[in-house]
Amino acid sequence: MGYANALEYLDTKLQEERTLIIETLIQGKLEEGEYKRLCGALQGLDLARNQIKDLAKRMEDE
């Protein structure tokens, strides 16, 4: 698979990590602390993906 640019690559890798975390969460076998940690990781990944999308838009507009 080719990537148009570095931002697309980063977004794809973050989405892959997000998918792995969600697959772990839906198994329902986590202790409370691990569940909270993974939920926080999801929030961080979503924030990072939003920042990447914002940066890509700003770069297009220049």
What are these regions (language model features)?
Residues 4, 10, 45, 60-61:
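Intrinsic-disorder/low-complexity regions
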Residues 23, 27-60:
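Short, charge-rich amphipathic interface segments used for partner binding and complex assembly
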